[in-house]
């Protein structure tokens, strides 16, 4: 195990290599046979299953139905929405043959499912009584990426994509924001990511959307990561796909739609926010194993105590290591997996009716407790552990958040720091493209939580009342 730890490059020497080393050495994933693909190993997929479980429960509270739609989309169907096809065309993988036979029409491997779902909705809806339709699917999508990295940016990835149809503009927009609130709560309370909620600029919004809302997080190295988006289309898509319904006044009206999604890049966010040079550090609610019990020696008495402890801690996901591996190996294995709580028990502990317990983020602070008190101690320790992870991430964000009023100030900040930079910005697409050309950065969001200002755009000097976060991003 020490050899395994030696393979993790220190974070402060090469953050990118550290991240890759964490992914590979903690056995979350391996590289796939095709460039840009990856193999989910069991431990990594268990994290994704927990993400699915938590989100699916929240979706069902707002009447979301799970469905599954085809992977292949006819080119003619995709081409109906001009902005949409232009936004995705560089990334679309296309099937042109079956065996040696050329297909009559190209088939796109879905980069997202708006078009195929809209086509379905157009045949499904007649009256306002049929609405809303609120669908979600857990699936894979493909976007042919040039630069790839496990979890963060792969050509094929797993995600959930929700698609809804509503009878009114306000209902659709409100549902779009309701989903964003679910994402925010999930990110903060389950993943312990102190995300910022806001709206995307005109340049950064989703192709074909009226508005795109986002949750943005800052990684340990100061680069931003988009963790989830919710798109409000108004009637942009429904007009293209002629999705009409008979309203309460018996008049035909175009419906209103939304889409929203998060992906396996959330696992990348977990790694880059919480982990350290010794391996993963996982929030308790998303850790496949919440408590690791390590038996220093295997005796009948110790086995009985371990079973008793498991009964007391039955609310938690527990793994017992009673293998013949060395004690040091067992400790290192629990450490590299990021297991929140570690309990050690051996003959000497048993003599005193004690166990030794420690947290993944404070491994040197081992404490001995009466094993009869284990439930009370673990409950509090888990709360303290999660709070500590969240506060550490929040402190990193605060320390890496800056303000600039001119492009010169902004460039100077970028030379010295990585992080969020709050600037007055006009919001124009041309201006943002100019900023990207000058600095290789882009806007992350227009934060909801801001006071209206009267200022000059930090780049073009036009009047503005917006403050926008810019950053380098994954």
Swiss-Prot record:
One of its GO terms (cellular component) is aminoacyl-tRNA synthetase multienzyme complex. Pfam families: HGTP_anticodon, ProRS-C_1, tRNA-synt_2b. Keywords: Aminoacyl-tRNA synthetase, ATP-binding, Cytoplasm, Ligase, Nucleotide-binding, Protein biosynthesis. It is an enzyme of class 6 (ligase). GO terms for molecular function: ATP binding; proline-tRNA ligase activity. Its EC number is 6.1.1.15. It comes from the Bacteria. One of its GO terms (biological process) is prolyl-tRNA aminoacylation. InterPro entries: aa-tRNA-synt_IIb, aa-tRNA-synth_II, aa-tRNA-synth_II/BPL/LPL, Anticodon-bd, Anticodon-bd_dom_sf, Pro-tRNA-ligase_IIa, Pro-tRNA-ligase_IIa_arc-type, Pro-tRNA_ligase_II_C. It catalyses: tRNA(Pro) + L-proline + ATP = L-prolyl-tRNA(Pro) + AMP + diphosphate. SMART domains: ProRS-C_1. It is found in: Cytoplasm. Consists of three domains: the N-terminal catalytic domain, the anticodon-binding domain and the C-terminal extension. Belongs to the class-II aminoacyl-tRNA synthetase family. ProS type 3 subfamily. Catalyzes the attachment of proline to tRNA(Pro) in a two-step reaction: proline is first activated by ATP to form Pro-AMP and then transferred to the acceptor end of tRNA(Pro). Homodimer. This is Proline--tRNA ligase.
